[in-house]
């Protein structure tokens, strides 16, 4: 079992993967359990991206390559843009409909 050394902190690859899987499972549970609130759905999707980024960093550090960090940088940039656009859409929907409950927003009204 290899250990990742980060500034005098030694984390094994197994522990990192368990953490990443736990983040991913929590985000999937958030999506499945709470389908009504659009903000919780957006946060769960961002948590999923965080789990994927953690995997990239773990495997890049394990193989001692910098490409994982580069991928994480670009994914974080895209995720930030996605979050900004998603929150802008949520604010626009809330201003027009006065709710963010997805069960009340499923009708196509003008």
UniProtKB/Swiss-Prot annotation:
- The domain of life for this entry's organism is Bacteria
Which reactions does this protein catalyse?
A: a quinone + NADH + 5 H(+)(in) = a quinol + NAD(+) + 4 H(+)(out)
Which Pfam family is one of those matched by this entry?
Oxidored_q2
Give the top-level enzyme category.
translocase
User: Which residues span the membrane?
Assistant: 13-33, 38-58, 70-90
List the membrane topology term(s).
Answer: Multi-pass membrane protein
Give the enzyme's EC designation.
Answer: 7.1.1.-
Where in or outside the cell it occurs: the entry states: Cell inner membrane
- InterPro entries in the record, alphabetically? NADH_UbQ_OxRdtase_chain4L/K, NUOK/Mnh_C1-like
GO process terms (BP):
ATP synthesis coupled electron transport
Gene3D superfamilies from the entry? 1.10.287.3510
Query: Any one cellular component term from GO for this entry?
Result: NADH dehydrogenase complex
| Predominant cellular place of this UniProt entry's protein | membrane
Q: What are the protein's GO molecular function terms?
A: NADH:ubiquinone reductase (non-electrogenic) activity; quinone binding
**Protein family:** Belongs to the complex I subunit 4L family.
Complex formation = NDH-1 is composed of 14 different subunits. Subunits NuoA, H, J, K, L, M, N constitute the membrane sector of the complex.
Explain the purpose of this protein: NDH-1 shuttles electrons from NADH, via FMN and iron-sulfur (Fe-S) centers, to quinones in the respiratory chain. The immediate electron acceptor for the enzyme in this species is believed to be ubiquinone. Couples the redox reaction to proton translocation (for every two electrons transferred, four hydrogen ions are translocated across the cytoplasmic membrane), and thus conserves the redox energy in a proton gradient.
Q: What is this protein called?
A: NADH-quinone oxidoreductase subunit K
Recorded source organism is Francisella tularensis subsp. holarctica (strain FTNF002-00 / FTA)
The lineage, from the top, is: Bacteria, Pseudomonadati, Pseudomonadota, Gammaproteobacteria, Thiotrichales
The encoding gene is: nuoK
